A protein has these predicted regions:
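Histidine-dependent nucleotide/RNA phosphoesterase domain, centered on the 2H-phosphoesterase fold
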Residues: 1-205
């Protein structure tokens, strides 16, 4: 049997983060998608029986695409210019469907892969190029990005086997969702959760 890496808390303060500080980033969100809601419900019993996991409600379900920077380090003028560039570039892309799931255990999360990767990578490239239209240096690496959606975040250290067993007992669940927009959000993690206000939604096509 393959040994699973132990769980650890996701909520350590990464460099630059603190209470009251927020971050501009591009995400795909799913609050209006019935299939995403069903998927959250399908896995809800697993999270309910595991207090070491903080569940992500549908409202805050997201696929992280591309960061810009902390809001106190990025001018509103640059934000506006990046949005305008993103609107132009995303107009050349078409909406598409992706499949989320099934869920698996990760050291800090229960997460679900999102496939196919290619259309998502095209959206991310458009966003990166839009940032590059405004700034000389685009933050974050172009390579190594794995599109995923997290269902819950670990809040403590401990063995991963009980989490994996609970997921296995629940069975594999997936959802097909439509991606027709990408959102620039103002993200915070003040309350041991990722919460945000939307700055602008940019449509594809």
């Amino acid at each position: 049997v393959t040994e699973i890496e132990p769980m650890r808390s996701h909520w350590w303060w990464r460099p630059g983060w603190r209470i009251g500080r927020s971050f501009y980033t591009w995400h795909i969100t799913f609050a209006e998608q019935a299939e995403a809601a069903r998927l959250v419900d399908d896995y809800a019993p697993v999270l309910a029986e595991l207090p070491v996991l903080d569940p992500v409600p549908l409202r805050w379900l997201h696929l992280t695409m591309q960061g810009i920077g902390f809001t106190d380090e990025v001018s509103r003028g640059d934000v506006g210019r990046i949005i305008s560039a993103a609107q132009k570039r995303c107009a050349d892309l078409e909406p598409f469907a992706v499949t989320i799931g099934p869920a698996h255990v990760d050291p800090e999360t229960i997460q679900m892969p999102v496939r196919p990767v290619e259309p998502l990578a095209a959206v991310r490239l458009a966003i990166r190029n839009a940032i590059g239209d405004v700034w000389d240096d685009v933050p974050e690496r172009a390579e190594g990005w794995r599109p995923h959606v997290s269902l819950g975040y670990s809040n403590a250290a401990g063995p991963a086997e009980p989490v994996a067993a609970a997921l296995a007992a629940r069975g594999e669940h997936v959802a097909e969702v439509r991606v027709d927009a990408v959102s620039l959000i103002d993200l915070n993690r003040d309350r041991q959760a990722y919460e945000w206000t939307e700055v602008r939604s940019v449509t594809l096509g």
